[in-house]
Amino acid sequence: MSRAEEAKQQFEKGFLCAPAVLSTYSEQLGLEKTLAVKIACGFGGGIGRTGRTCGAVTGAVMAIGLKHGQVNLADEESRLRTYMLVKEFIDKFTTLHGSIECKDLIGYDLSNSGELRSARESGVFQNKCPGFVYDSARILEDIVL
C-alpha cells in the first residue's frame, strides 16, 4: 500500500484530515505518531471547523516544515526552501482541486451549524475528503519525501 493510500485509510478510519496526512509521515520525519496526531488535531475542518485552509493541506505543510524547516535564525536557506516547497505543494493541490479552502472544496461552510449538519447528511466527508487526503499525501511524496 502506498503512503498516500495509508493516509486516506487513516482518514477513513476516523482520523481528521490533517492528522491523517501528518501522522502518516511523522515517524519518518522524527516525530512520534501520537504527538503528530495531537499537534494536527486543531487543523481539521479547515482549521478548527472554520472552513478555511483544508486540513489535508495543513497536514502536508506541517510535514514539509518537519522535513525542511528552519531550526535557528541564521538558517535562512531552510526557511526559504520551506516556503518554496509549500508554494509548490499549494500550486499543485490548487491545480487539481481549484482551491485549498475547505468550504470551497466541499461546498459547505463548517463554521455554520446548519451547513455542518447538511455536510454530514450529504456524505461529503466520506465522498470528497478522502480524495483530498490522498492527493495531499501524493503531492507531498512527489515534491518532498
Feature-to-residue mapping (PLM):
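Acidic-glycine-rich active-site phosphate/pyrophosphate-binding loop
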Residues: 22-42, 108-113
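C-terminal binding/interaction regions
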Residues: 82-145
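Phosphate-handling active-site elements
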Residues: 28-38, 66-85
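Short glycine/serine- and small hydrophobic-enriched flexible loop segments
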Residues: 23-27, 62-69, 138-142
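Short cysteine clusters
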Residues: 17, 54, 102
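Glycine/serine-rich anion-binding loops at beta->alpha junctions
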Residues: 43-62
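Polybasic, low-complexity association/targeting segments
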Residues: 1-13
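Mg2+-dependent prenyl diphosphate-binding active-site environment of isoprenoid biosynthetic enzymes
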Residues: 20, 57-69, 80-83, 91
